[in-house]
C-alpha cells in the first residue's frame, strides 16, 4: 500500500523508562536505528543496543541545565520534513538532516509534581518544552512519522510491530497523532490550571 511507511530511525527521549525494554528489543530486531539524549541514551546502551547521541546529529550540546536538548533544526527538520515534497527532501540533504520516522517521548510529570506540594521553582522546571514540541511535530507530520506520546502507547506500537514488522499504515499513524494531541492538550490544560490558581 502506498500509505505504508517503514520505521528506520527512532528518536527516543523519555522521563519514565519502565516498560520500554520490550519495545526497544522489537525495534532493534527490526533493524531500527536509535537516536537519544542523556539518561535515555544511557538506558538504551545499558541494554546492549547501539544508540547515537542527538548531540552528534546537532553538533550542539545539551545546554541550560538540560532545558535545551532536542530543540534544534536537525531534530525537528528530521521529524517535520515531508518525504514526498521535493523541496523538503533537497533541504534535508543540503543541511544533512536525518529522517526520523518514529518519536517515542513522554513528558515531565507536571501534575504529580504539583500534587507533591513542590516549590514553584520545582514545578516550573517540570513544564516540559522539548517533549511537548516533539509530540506536536510528530503528530503534525503523521503522514510520515509515528508518534508515541506516552508509555500507555508502547503496547499499541508493539502489537503493530509484531503483526506488521516495522511498517505502519497512514490510518495507524493518524490514530497515534490523535492520541498525541490528546496528551498535549491535557498537559497544557493542567499547566494552565496551575497558573490560574
In which residue ranges do the predicted regions lie?
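Structural motif
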Residues: 2, 27, 92-95, 137
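Internal alpha/beta core interface subdomains
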Residues: 5-8, 97-197
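Glycine-rich nucleotide/cofactor/substrate-binding loop typically near the N-terminus or early
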Residues: 39-109
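Conserved residues at beta->alpha junctions
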Residues: 14, 83, 148
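N-terminal glycine-/serine-/threonine-rich phosphate-binding loop
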Residues: 1-57
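Short, basic, glycine/proline-bearing loop/turn elements
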Residues: 6-10, 73-80, 120
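Short, flexible coil/turn micro-motifs enriched in small/turn-prone residues
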Residues: 33-34, 60, 125-126
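Short glycine/serine/threonine-rich phosphate/pyrophosphate-binding segments
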Residues: 19-20, 87, 132
Amino acid at each position: 500500500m502506498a500509505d505504508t511507511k517503514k520505521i528506520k530511525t527512532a528518536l527516543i527521549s523519555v522521563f519514565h523508562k519502565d516498560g520500554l525494554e520490550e519495545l526497544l528489543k522489537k525495534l532493534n530486531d527490526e533493524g531500527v536505528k536509535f537516536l537519544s539524549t542523556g539518561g535515555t541514551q544511557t538506558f538504551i546502551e545499558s541494554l546492549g543496543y547501539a544508540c547515537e547521541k542527538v548531540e552528534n546529529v546537532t553538533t550542539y550540546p545539551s545546554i541550560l541545565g538540560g532545558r535545551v536538548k532536542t530543540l534544534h533544526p536537525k531534530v525537528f527538520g528530521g521529524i517535520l520534513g515531508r518525504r514526498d515534497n521535493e523541496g523538503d527532501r533537497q533541504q534535508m540533504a543540503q543541511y544533512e538532516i536525518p529522517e526520523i520516522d518514529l518519536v517515542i517521548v513522554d513528558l515531565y510529570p507536571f501534575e504529580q509534581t504539583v500534587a507533591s506540594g513542590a516549590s514553584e521553582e520545582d514545578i516550573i522546571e517540570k513544564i516540559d518544552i522539548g517533549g511537548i514540541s516533539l509530540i506536536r511535530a510528530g503528530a503534525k507530520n503523521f503522514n510520515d512519522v509515528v508518534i508515541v506520546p506516552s508509555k500507555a502507547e508502547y503496547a499499541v506500537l508493539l502489537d503493530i510491530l509484531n503483526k506488521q514488522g516495522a511498517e505502519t499504515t497512514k490510518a495507524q499513524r493518524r490514530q497515534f497523532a490523535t492520541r498525541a494531541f490528546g496528551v498535549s492538550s491535557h498537559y497544557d490544560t493542567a499547566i494552565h490550571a496551575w497558573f490560574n490558581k
